[in-house]
Structures are given as structure tokens and as C-alpha cells.
Amino acid sequence: MSHSNPPTGASGGPGSASASAAPARGYYSLKRSIQTAFNDPLDRGLGPPAYQSKVRVMDKYQVIGFISSGTYGRVYKARGRQGQPGEFAIKKFKPDKEGEQITYTGISQSAIREMALCSELRHPNVIRLVETILEDKAIFMVFEYAEHDLLQIIHHHTQQPKHPIPPQTIKSIMFQLLNGCQYLHTNWVLHRDLKPANIMVTSSGEVKVGDLGLARIFWKPVRTLMQGDKVVVTIWYRAPELLMGSHHYTPAVDMWAVGCIFAELLSLRPIFKGEEAKMDNTKKGGSRDMPFQRHQMQKIVDIMGMPTKERWPLLTSMPDYDKLPLLQPPLSASGYSQQPAHSHHHHQHYNQGPQYGGRAGGPTSSSSANSSSAAAAASQSHLDKWYYHTVSQGQTAGPMPHAPPGSLASLGVEGYKLLAGLLEYDPEKRLTAAAALQHNFFSTGDRVSANCFEGCKAEYPHRRVSQEDNDIRTGSVPGTKRSGMPDDSMGRPGKRVKE
């Protein structure tokens, strides 16, 4: 996918009125510190609408409790004061030290990016930034509050007695999620960390894409996207082109993650649950090599089949193409049926021909034919078997002509086609958000509701809020997660392996 046109609505270029209105002030601003810039009354009314100068958090918001913590800070639930109704999530970015004298050295690149993007984005299916406040050298981002997230909803359905998410709920969630993604991509924004924990759901059933800490503008980047952030997207939702070491990528990486989320809504567990290999930090000079994520790629191959240059023409240009022989051929399709799985070949390394990076040639024409046959079998996708086995609750590995109304099987063949379009190996062929929204999946069967809870009998628990640690001003900032809104409090994914 290539993009050569500038973002729609771009303004303020060198020849614009806004660019030439106040040259003196622009020169002055270069000399100011960040602290002075925040407090300077000249900034009032000139920045984004969400910006506030000299406002104290506790004057505007009553903190109800602590939600979660992350690398960059903590998230609190709050209620509005001064005639500002409603509940809010306040994300506090920690200063360099707390409880001691603070040396202000600046703001992290991730925080700046998140503040800049969120202040510009306005869409019903993207979490809304209400305002940003600087107080005592700490930054507070005030977001609209969402009572649920998809991880919490999925977890609720895994509790005994285990019960599937209603199909009309899944359809509404997917439509709203794709709507939010289309808005981001239309505005040249890659999310780069879509997963159930980052998809918020309000009490009224509105689905909102949240946590833009890894988001990035992808229109004409100065450097390859990988140079800025080597590791993007949580491992279970990471697209094949990222796993194969691609240095540049497109919104298709978000769409693969959306496909993984769709599959997880159906099965209540991650479809590709691999383990992440750690970076090698032992190299001289402090360089850090990105390891080939063999285990995660194997999980994809087990269901999707081995990638080939016929299915994915640019496969041979991937940096880790030569690592494909390390992978094993997938289990046979019988693994998704009622018959025993025949997996006697599953523990042999796959090295059957040059199209997979193997050695070309063979001793006889017979062995060559066998090799071609094995390659064809290894590249066959079993996603259809996985889908029908999942939606039929294990009853069949094929379509059900007369699926009971209200059952997952009622999502039918169009559900499979949408899933297959999102989980396409080739990012050029993968469905875009705009194309997915036009898919027959949303125009057949029950109408798509703007409230994903409409007709749903499940009562989902409220978000956990701690009353013991709700001092937004002086609390310490523990935690090791990259982002604090919200953190993945259900403990996933955590296991790593050293390659």
C-alpha cells in the first residue's frame, strides 16, 4: 500500500495566513523553557481546544480511586466538579522523581505523541481526550471514562458456566471497532497496539479505540517506522510482516490485529497464543538485535498454513525470509474435526523447496513430486475448519445449513469470509477498514446496533477501582507496563522465551 497524497484538510503551510500572522512570537517561543511555555498566558486560545493553562486537577475533578499503573504513570477514575458532570479517566505521567526534589528534564516521546494525536482526534469510536493539565511538573491527560474493555468482557464469558458472546454483540463490536480504525487510518494514524485490553466499551455500549501511546502518523515518515519503535503490537496480535522483520509497514498491521480480536471474541481465547522471544542485549556496543519470533509465527502457521510467494509475493523480500525453514508444517485439518488428529509429521522441520528458503533440487523426480505435494499440503489454510469448529461449539468443522437463531453459528459463512479477509498473509490483499465495513457480514442477518449491549442478557462487572491508593498528587508510580490506560490487569501476555 502506498500513499502519496497529503492528509485531507492539512493547513498552516509556509504560505498560509496562520503561518505569517505572528513571526515575532514564534521567535520568542524558541527561547522559552517548556515550563514557561505551559504557563505563558500568550498560549491561551492558540493551542488545541483541550489545552488549559494554570488549572489544578483537584479543583476540577474529584478522584474516586486508582485504576492501573504503567511505565509512564498511573490512571485514576474521577468525577467532575464545577458543573462538569460525568466520570473521567485521568492519566498522570510521572515526573523524574516523586517525593523528592523534581528535576524536570522533559516529556517522553510517547507522551508527546499521545497528547498531540489525542488533542486532534474526534470520533465516537475513538476515546476522547477532554483536556491536558500541567501541575507541579506532572502532566495529566483527562479522558472520557469507559466502564468496560473487551478483555474484561471476554474474561467474563470464560467464567463458569462458560458461555459465548452473543453474535449480535460481536457484530456491533466489530462494526464500531472498524469504524474507529477507518477514522484513524483516514487521518493517517497507525494505532500499532490494538488488542482487547485497549478497546474500551462504555456502559451504553459504545466501543472506543483507546491507548494511543504507540500510535504514529504514517504519511511520508522521515525514518522507517521500525527505526522509531522496534517493537510494536503485543505479540499475540502482531502481523506476519512484523514477525518477518519488515522495516516499514502500513495500516494493514492494525487490520491483522482486528482479525485476531474478532477470532478472540468468537473463541474467548487468543487465536495465535505464542511466546515472545527476548531481545539479545549481550552484543558489543550495546546493540540490540530483533530475534525471529519463531514461536509466534509457528502458531500462525499451525492454522493459516505456511506462507508462500504465491500467496504473498513480497514474502521473499522480508528480512527474516531465510528463517522460514525453522518452522514446522501445520497440523492436518483433522485436528479441527471429531476424528483424531494425525500429527506424525508435525515435529519435522520444514525444508521442502526453494519457495520456503530450502535447498532446491532433489535426487529423483519422485522425491521432487513428493516435495511439491508436501509443500502444497503445508501451505493449505485450516482457518475455515477453525472457524466452523469454533462457532458450532465443536459440533462440526463445516458450515451449518440450519444454524439456530442467536447461536454463534448464525454468523454463517460471511463471518468466516470477514475473518479470512482480515487474517490474510499478504498485507496488500488484507481487508482495509473501509472495505471491511462494506462486507456482507454487516448487511446480512440481524441489523447492526450502535449499542453492543442491546439484547444482551449478560451483566458485566464494573471496572475495578482501588480506594486505598487514590492520591493523584503524591502517589508513587510503580509498574512495568508501557502504558497506563488501562493496564492489562488480567495478566496477559506475560510468558517469554529466550531464543
Swiss-Prot record:
Cross-referenced SUPFAM superfamilies: Protein kinase-like (PK-like)
Cofactor needs: Mg(2+)
Active site residues of this protein: 193
Binding site for ATP: 67-75, 91
Protein kinase domain: residues covered: 61-442
Catalytic activity: L-seryl-[protein] + ATP = O-phospho-L-seryl-[protein] + ADP + H(+); L-threonyl-[protein] + ATP = O-phospho-L-threonyl-[protein] + ADP + H(+); [DNA-directed RNA polymerase] + ATP = phospho-[DNA-directed RNA polymerase] + ADP + H(+)
Record PANTHER family: CELL DIVISION PROTEIN KINASE (PTHR24056), CYCLIN-DEPENDENT KINASE 8-RELATED (PTHR24056:SF495)
Family: Belongs to the protein kinase superfamily. CMGC Ser/Thr protein kinase family. CDC2/CDKX subfamily.
UniProt protein name: Serine/threonine-protein kinase SSN3
